[in-house]
Every structure is written in C-alpha cells, then in structure tokens.
C-alpha cells in the first residue's frame, strides 16, 4: 500500500498540542475533537501554511523511501551516474574512431596530427572531482614527422585545498616532487595559462571548425584528471566563452593506439586478428622508454624524477606510437623525432631460412652484424672467421645462443645456426 498522505488539519493539531499546556495532557482523539471547531472557523489563508507543510512532508516521505546502497547513496542517482559515464565512454570511442577513419579515407593517416597531453596535480578534493594542477605538457605528433613540437610549463595555483596539505605533500613526495604552494614554481596566472594552451592548440589544429572543441589525448586513468585541471584553469579565465572549459575535448590515447594499430595493419595488408584492446594496452603500459634520459623538464631532470615529468610522458607516448606502428607504414624513424635522441643499438637476429633460400639484408645490417661478431670475438676464447663473398661466419661454439626479439620474442635462436647462414 502507498504511504498515507499528510493533512493540513493534522499538522495544525500537532502544532496546537505542542504549543498549549492543555493539549499535552490530551490524547490524539481528544485533541482532534477539540481542534475540529477551531479549524472550521479558520480562513483559507490561515490554513495555507499547514496545507503547505503537509505537502512538504509528503515529498520528504517519498525521498526517504528511496532505496539506498551499502554506502548510503540513493540507488537511482548512482544508476543515473553510471549510465552517463557509459554514454560518455561510448561517445569518446566514437569520436576517436571517426578521427582515424576520416584520416584513412583521405589517404593521409601518416600526416594526421595528434596532440598528447598530461597534467601533474598537487591534491584532489575529498568529495568532488576537483584536482589542483601542478604541471602541464603537450606534444604534437604525426607518423611522418614524429614529435613536431612540445609545450610544457610548471603551474603555481597559489594555494591548495584547505585541510589537505598533508595529502598534497605525500602525493608530491611519492610522484613529481614539486614544491607545494606558496613555494610552487611556474605560471601563477591560471587564465593566462589557459589562453596560452588554447593558442597552442589552435596553431596545431589550424582550419578546425570553430564550433567544435580541440581534441587531445591522454592515458585512460588520467582522463578525469586532465578534464578537471582544464576546468580549473578555465574557471579563472576572464573570457566568459571559456568559462566551462568546453573548448577542449579529452579522449583516451590507449583506445587511439588500438584503433590506429588495426587501421595501419589494414593499410599494410596484414591480418589484425590477434590485435585487441588488451594487447595494445599491455604494449602501451609497458612504457619501454620510461627511463629515457634528457627528455624531461629541467626541474625533474635535476631531481631525478623524470619518470613522473609530464613532458617526459607525452614524449614517451609519441615514441611508443612510432615504435609500434612506423614499421608497418614503412616509415624510417629519426632520432629525436620518432625515437629518443640517445638510443642504444637494437640488434635483431633472424632465423635461418629453408635450404636454398637466402636472407637478404641491406648493407647497413651486414656491417652491424660483422661489428657485433668482432665484439664477441674479444669477449670469448674462440676465434671467429669472417670473410668470403658473400660474407660467411663460422667457428662459433654451438651452445652460444641469442634472443630473436624481432620475430620470436622470448625464443632462443642457436647462434651457430645463424652464423652459418649465407648473407646476401
């Protein structure tokens, strides 16, 4: 049965009992009998407050009847938020797919520009999704050109959320190690910084529809942080058109990597059956360039925290994209653009082909192999014989093995087998 509605008359009876000493000694039935004659003589204006109070009581009763979860949250509200989150995720994926497919249809995927962004923050509000920014970086990237430009700045918000100094200090000491306000470094004018970011994005995405937002990409777990930090900067901007920070749309870089890999393989005519989001996420999160030197800002380079530097992050993401897909597009990588400026040689060894076949290596690969063999000669007690036309190699211990990272990851290849292979 539905709950009984409150009546204005009973609201009046309860008030009369509370305010009159005589009414406190009467039962409900006696009080109703006594107040009935008084209620009949009251005008509509006098009865109005009691009738309004009864309606308000009905509303409160309905609210109290809402089902709650184990955290005391209204289930209907939680379900609404979950639906909105799911819709937001679907919209983000559709937008990413549309960007990639448009570039593919125009046969210009190699020159399409992507902007990677990252924020460091001091602290997060306990009850809301407000993050106080500490550092920002962005990089402009394309497959053909690699990293085309980088924007990086430290941020001094002036103050942190009251009562969260300890949390901010702990977060800083375990991650970016930036000094807290009022000793923070970098730009103090949030509105100016936001305008500078918009100006940087407008130069990259020149010719964009003015009614559409700028599109940037960041890690999956950093999407809410980046969105919140952009809103934080925008709210202090004097230009009302940027008030809500809606001019920048933040998308998932890990989903971008997945979609790009599938489309790149399709362009190359290679099967993508083994490519799924779990595979590309695992590759991205390995962060092969995590300890690359001299790509972070000066502060983090000097304090040995380059791993957490946002400038290092956005550059490492670009290197990851190049390392994962440039070979599929037959794009030669350039140090400082597609890969770090200082990179150790990556020697790749290939299995011996069937009898009668030959491995075809460019001259640079032959020279690399011969150089490596000479190095191994100095490190062992065996003599290696390198010579002939075409060059051949022999006299190597049969139990010596090397890894073949190019073709069979984590599979040992007998070095003797490789060295007796004819190189052409």
Curated annotation (Swiss-Prot):
InterPro entries linked to this entry: HMG_box_dom_sf (IPR036910), Maelstrom (IPR024970), Protein_maelstrom (IPR039259)
Record-linked Gene3D superfamilies: High mobility group box domain (1.10.30.10)
Coiled-coil features, chain-numbered ranges: none
Molecular functions (GO terms): transcription cis-regulatory region binding
Example GO BP: germ-line stem cell population maintenance
Compartments, record wording: Cytoplasm; Nucleus
Pfam families in UniProt: Maelstrom
Keyword field contains Calcium: no
Keyword ATP-binding on entry: no
DNA-binding stretch(es), residue numbering of this chain: 2-69
Any single Gene Ontology cellular-component annotation: cytoplasm
UniProt entry keywords in alphabetical sequence: Cytoplasm, Developmental protein, Differentiation, DNA-binding, Meiosis, Nucleus, Oogenesis, Repressor, RNA-mediated gene silencing, Transcription, Transcription regulation
SUPFAM superfamilies: HMG-box
Functional description taken from the UniProt entry: Involved both in the piRNA and miRNA metabolic processes. As a component of the meiotic nuage, plays a central role during oogenesis by repressing transposable elements and preventing their mobilization, which is essential for the germline integrity. Repression of transposable elements is mediated via the piRNA metabolic process, which mediates the repression of transposable elements during meiosis by forming complexes composed of piRNAs and Piwi proteins and governs the repression of transposons.
UniProt protein name: Protein maelstrom 1
Protein's organism: Drosophila ananassae
Underlying gene: mael1
């Amino acid at each position: 049965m539905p709950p009984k509605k409150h009546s204005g008359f009973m609201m009046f009876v309860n008030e009369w009992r509370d305010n009159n000493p005589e009414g406190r000694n009467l039962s409900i039935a006696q009080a109703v009998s006594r107040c009935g004659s008084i209620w009949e003589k009251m005008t509509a204006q006098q009865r109005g407050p009691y009738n309004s109070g009864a309606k308000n009581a009905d509303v409160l009763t309905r609210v109290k009847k809402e089902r709650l979860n184990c955290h005391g949250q209204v289930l209907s509200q939680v379900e609404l938020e979950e639906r909105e989150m799911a819709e937001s995720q679907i919209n983000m994926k559709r937008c990413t797919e549309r960007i990639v497919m448009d570039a593919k249809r125009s046969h210009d995927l190699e020159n399409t520009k992507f902007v990677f962004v990252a924020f460091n923050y001091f602290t997060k509000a306990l009850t809301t999704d407000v993050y106080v920014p500490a550092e920002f970086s962005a990089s402009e990237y394309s497959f053909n050109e690699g990293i085309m430009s980088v924007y990086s700045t430290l941020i001094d918000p002036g103050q942190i959320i009251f009562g969260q100094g300890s949390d901010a200090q702990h977060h800083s000491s375990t991650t970016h190690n930036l000094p807290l306000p009022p000793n923070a470094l970098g730009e103090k004018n949030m509105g100016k910084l936001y305008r500078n970011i918009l100006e940087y994005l407008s130069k990259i995405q020149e010719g964009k529809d003015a009614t559409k937002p700028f599109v940037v990409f960041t890690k999956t777990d950093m999407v809410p942080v980046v969105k919140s930090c952009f809103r934080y900067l925008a709210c202090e901007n004097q230009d009302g058109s940027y008030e809500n920070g809606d001019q920048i749309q933040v998308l998932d870089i890990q989903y971008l990597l997945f979609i790009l890999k599938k489309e790149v393989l399709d362009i190359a005519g290679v099967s993508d059956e083994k490519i799924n989001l779990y595979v590309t996420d695992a590759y991205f999160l390995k962060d092969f360039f995590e300890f690359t030197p001299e790509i972070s800002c000066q502060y983090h380079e000097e304090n040995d925290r380059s791993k957490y530097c946002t400038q290092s992050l956005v550059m490492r993401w670009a290197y990851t994209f190049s390392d994962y897909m440039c070979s599929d597009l037959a794009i030669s990588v350039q140090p400082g653009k597609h890969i770090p400026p200082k990179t150790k040689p990556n020697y790749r060894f290939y299995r011996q082909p069937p009898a009668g076949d030959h491995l075809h290596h460019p001259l640079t690969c032959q020279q690399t192999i011969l150089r490596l063999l000479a190095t191994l000669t100095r490190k062992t007690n065996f003599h290696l014989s390198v010579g002939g036309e075409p060059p051949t190699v022999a006299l190597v211990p049969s139990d010596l093995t090397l890894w073949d990272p190019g073709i069979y990851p984590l599979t040992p290849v007998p070095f003797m087998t490789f060295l007796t292979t004819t190189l052409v």
